[in-house]
């Protein structure tokens, strides 16, 4: 156990909620950090607030970073179509938001250093890094090197460390751990479509629903699931 502080990037989804809960389980005082970046699925921000309250986080902050200003992703540009045919492992999907995680992690590290936090907790996992370049282990290792070189705390040898506890986990493993930890999964939000009810057909809904079915909880699946 530890009395140290951790900053958890909290999207409002299942993965980040589970990572934050694992940080709490490890004894960290957790501060949640969410981002309004112009995403079409802004409902996830409401979910992040609900999860922060459910987990009794020490603090929760939402930062405005308008990445929709220049688009480049189906998550920030409504002219682009969301993928619904299954996750592509050979190409980077159009749900990739240019530079998003680089921006988020940089801001998270700024808050971590300002607050003297020991960890920056990320919910990236094996499903993410199969498609997204900024969720892969080599990216996280490189960013850690950058953080150690670019911050006063890092240069002094006590800078915050990136912690991605789910990085090797499947979505089913994450769902099972979330259930074990008592996370209110029904309050999390994964759907990319931007409505008030999960669509059940976007890739994010599909992956989540498959994991929940495998974990034995069909009652938590999207209402719109085919």
Curated annotation (Swiss-Prot):
GO biological process per UniProt: queuosine biosynthetic process
Enzyme Commission designation: 6.3.4.20
Cofactor note: Binds 1 zinc ion per subunit.
Cofactor dependence: Zn(2+)
UniProt-listed Pfam families: QueC
Annotated catalysed reactions: 7-carboxy-7-deazaguanine + NH4(+) + ATP = 7-cyano-7-deazaguanine + ADP + phosphate + H2O + H(+)
Residue positions binding Zn(2+): 191, 199, 202, 205
InterPro entries, per database record: QueC, Rossmann-like_a/b/a_fold
UniProt function note: Catalyzes the ATP-dependent conversion of 7-carboxy-7-deazaguanine (CDG) to 7-cyano-7-deazaguanine (preQ(0)).
Family indicated by similarity: Belongs to the QueC family.
Protein name: 7-cyano-7-deazaguanine synthase
Organism: Synechococcus sp. (strain CC9311)
Encoding gene, per UniProt annotation: queC
């Amino acid at each position: 156990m530890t009395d140290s502080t951790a900053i958890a990037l909290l999207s409002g989804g299942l993965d980040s909620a589970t990572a934050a809960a694992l940080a709490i389980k490890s004894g960290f005082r957790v501060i949640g950090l969410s981002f309004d970046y112009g995403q079409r699925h802004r409902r996830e921000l409401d979910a992040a607030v609900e999860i922060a309250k459910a987990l009794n986080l020490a603090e929760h902050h939402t930062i405005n970073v308008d990445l929709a200003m220049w688009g480049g992703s189906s998550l920030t540009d409504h002219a682009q179509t969301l993928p619904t045919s299954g996750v592509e492992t050979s190409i980077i999907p159009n749900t990739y938001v240019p530079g998003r995680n680089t921006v988020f992690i940089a801001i998270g590290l700024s808050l971590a250093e300002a607050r003297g936090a020991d960890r920056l907790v990320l919910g990236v996992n094996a499903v993410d890094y199969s498609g997204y370049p900024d969720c892969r282990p080599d990216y996280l290792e490189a960013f850690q090197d950058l953080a150690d070189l670019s911050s006063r705390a890092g240069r002094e040898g006590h800078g915050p460390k990136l912690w991605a506890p789910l990085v090797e986990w499947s979505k089913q493993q994450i769902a099972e751990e979330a259930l074990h930890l008592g996370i209110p999964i029904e309050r999390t939000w994964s759907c990319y479509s931007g409505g008030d009810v999960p669509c059940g057909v976007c890739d994010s809904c599909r992956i989540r629903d498959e994991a929940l079915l495998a974990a034995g909880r069909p009652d938590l699946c999207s209402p719109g699931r085919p």
